[in-house]
Amino acid sequence: ARPEDSGLFDGNSPAFTMRFNSARTEWRLVQERCDNCQFAPPHMSCVRRGKQQVAFIRHARTAVGDGISNTMEACIPGLYTDGSAVVWCPVLGRGDLAAAAMLYHSGGERCHETQHLITRQPVWNEEVESLVLDFKGRHVTSSAKNFQLALEQKPTHIICQYGKLANSSFGLDFKFPM
C-alpha cells in the first residue's frame, strides 16, 4: 500500500452498516457516527439505541405483464426548507424509519420529515417479449437487477438508477436528494 493511502479505509470502522431481516426483504442502513451524537460521550449517544438511520428499504416481487419485476420502496430522512437533511437519531426522539413507512402505507398520515421512494415499474414490451425500462441515454444491458427509484410524489422524476453495463459491471447513478 502507498503511504498516502494509509488511513483511508479501516475495515473495522465502517462509515455505514446495513442489516436485513430473516426473510431478506427489509434492510436498514445506519450511519456509524451519528451527526447529532458524534461529540457526545457514548452513554449519552445513540450508539446503543439503534444509531442514526439513513434508510429503510423493502423489497418485493410483482407481476408485470408476462414477467416478474423486483420492486423496492425506501423511506429516507427528509429535507428541511433550507435544504439540510433531517438527522434520524433516536436521541432526538425519532423512532424507526420503518415505522414511518408502515404508518404511511397503512393509511396513516405521512410523516413530513421523511421521503418515500418507489420503484419505477418496467413495462412489458411485446416486440422483445420482455420487461423494459428506459435509462434515458445510459447504455444498459437487460438484467433482473436493474432498477430505478423516484420520489413517491414525483413518480416520473428518477433520482436513483442501477443498471447492468457489461458482463460483471454495474452502474449506480443518483442525484439530489439522495
Residue ranges of predicted features:
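Cationic, beta-structured binding surfaces that engage anionic biopolymers and membranes
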Residues: A1-M178
